[in-house]
From Swiss-Prot:
It is found in: Membrane. The lineage of its organism: Eukaryota, Metazoa, Ecdysozoa, Nematoda, Chromadorea. One of its GO terms (molecular function) is olfactory receptor activity. It is a multi-pass membrane protein. The chain crosses the membrane at residues 52-72, 92-112, 135-155, 172-192, 218-238, 276-296, 303-323. One of its GO terms (cellular component) is membrane. It comes from Caenorhabditis elegans. This is Serpentine receptor class beta-18. Pfam families: 7TM_GPCR_Sra. It comes from the Eukaryota.
Length: 363
């Protein structure tokens, strides 16, 4: 059979360029090309660049965990957000933590497996789809959950901006958003993996099973543009709440609420902008990967495919942006307090005492 005939017969996922036999391959069916054999999986898994790509997920995920812990312990109490937004941001952080732990455990396991593998059993580096299910469902649910959570935050902000009885029904709106977040994310993941074949094998649990690739692409196309829509919404909401703040100068309660809404809108603008940029990068990387994959050596293609999953970078970058936003708003708030005290307090000693009392509430 020619290379094209082998590819057309379904014995190779690409037009084969290497014509060798893979001994001790007890997984692949007879006639499978070398590129799809366990021998190629072994060569890929034991290559330094593939291990480095896997380790990059461990590094970014670990740094993301550290930043989330720092935010919770040091900055969360200073981060003034509307109640519903705070709860949904906590869900975002929960998804980031779960995703990061999943990536760390998953890739450390595969790296250890690669060092234990040998040519006498090249299929040792592969894992069953059923074995990978807990890892796959976890990171897929968290990825979808992060996108849907952003959507829920903006529904809440739109309700706050334009629904007159928002304050009265605030908790009901929050409960509806949480239910929507969990149900939609779960249904998407169940639908995507409904046709997976549990007895087939994968080189990495990060890989999507062949039977689910098209459905995952459809789900990604449908869900991730949410970040771009929300980015433009954040601009409109910031302007809306800024006008509301300027119109409430003589009502302390309304002015404080409006100021919190303005700060939260600026915070959402920065985080959503980061998310949109990362999702754009992810889309471009995935598209380029599909275009050039068949023209690359299999080890290089699989390495680039591993790197193109940028959610580990997402789980590092977004918490970092959140912390930077809190630092900026805290510094600005302290500056305003200092200016206010300088104008209102009587006498040097009185100003100093009053400033220290005001300052202590932010430390």
């Amino acid at each position: 059979m020619t290379s094209e005939e082998i590819h057309a017969a379904g014995l190779c996922s690409v037009v084969p360029t290497i014509f060798q036999n893979c001994d001790n391959d007890w997984i692949s069916k007879n006639g499978t090309c070398y590129q799809d054999s366990c021998c190629m999986s072994l060569e890929t898994a034991t290559s330094w660049y593939y291990r480095l790509a896997q380790f990059s997920h461990v590094v970014f995920s670990f740094m993301g965990l550290i930043i989330v812990v720092v935010y919770i312990l040091r900055y969360r109490s200073r981060h003034i957000l509307p109640e519903n937004v705070r709860v949904l941001v906590d869900f975002m952080l929960l998804f980031i933590v779960a995703h990061s732990i999943d990536m760390i455990v998953l890739h450390i396991y595969h790296i250890i497996q690669s060092f234990q593998a040998n040519i006498s059993d090249p299929c040792f580096v592969r894992e069953k789809v059923s074995f990978c299910a807990p890892f796959r469902y976890t990171f897929s649910f968290c990825s979808m959950g992060l996108a849907i959570c952003t959507y829920c935050i903006y529904i809440d902000r739109l309700a706050c901006a334009y629904y007159k009885n928002y304050t009265k029904h605030q908790r009901l709106i929050l409960a509806a958003q949480i239910c929507q977040l969990i149900v939609i994310s779960s249904l998407i993941i169940i639908w995507v993996y409904r046709n997976e074949e549990p007895n087939t094998y994968l080189l990495s649990c990060l890989n999507v099973p062949v039977a689910s690739v098209e459905d995952m692409a459809k789900a990604t196309i449908a869900v991730f543009p949410i970040n771009f829509i929300c980015f433009f919404l954040s601009i409109g909401l910031f302007r809306h709440f800024k006008k509301k703040e300027e119109g409430s100068r003589f009502d302390i309660v309304r002015h404080f609420t409006a100021s919190v809404d303005v700060e939260s809108s600026e915070f959402l603008f920065r985080t959503t902008g980061t998310q949109a940029a990362l999702m754009a990068l992810f889309s471009v990387a995935s598209l380029l990967m599909r275009l050039v994959y068949n023209f690359l050596p299999r080890q290089v293609g699989l390495t680039i495919a591993t790197l193109s999953y940028i959610m580990s970078i997402y789980c590092f970058t977004v918490p970092l942006v959140i912390v930077k936003c809190v630092q900026k708003t805290s510094a600005l708030r302290k500056s305003r307090i200092s200016s206010h005290v300088g104008l209102k307090a009587m006498g040097v000693e009185g100003a100093s005492n009053y400033f220290e009392m005001m300052k202590s509430q932010w430390e």
